[in-house]
Amino acid sequence: MENNIRNKVHWSENVIIADADHIDNVAFDLIVNFERMIGRRIPPADMAKWVDCVALDGGIREGDNEVLVILIHDRLKKAMDNFVPANFQKDLDGMAFKDHLGEFSFSSYPVEEMVESSDFFIDILNTICAQKEVKRVMVIRLLTPPTVRDI
């Protein structure tokens, strides 16, 4: 895996690595709760706006920045349910957009059967941090799985 990501990815100074399944679940929770409060339907979250918010929280400011967004997802999940664009292969992987913060390029990687999700995520995070070009890393990941008490 490490060689695959090293060969496939053009490293940017700024990298966002996100557990796509987790952010999709968080978006679902927010949408459901706010729909109840305001009494109307809320559309899926805009991926570009979400990425902008993460970048701003991570210290990126307006300018000609390059940001690599890496989405890690379950291999059985082809798309997120609560974001647009949502399909990992068709809409996100290899795509990019440019706005006032810079250019955001997307890569998505499914977690295959032979590896645990947490191990895969850590391997990719270690690979990112080992790249000399990378100066800023923003990580979005559920650190502990929910227990019965959390549900």
Regions found by a protein language model. Give the residues of each.
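Domain-level signal for Mg2+-assisted phosphodiester chemistry and nucleotide/NA-binding surfaces
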Residues: 2-108
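Nuclease catalytic cores that cleave nucleic-acid phosphodiester bonds
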Residues: 97-151
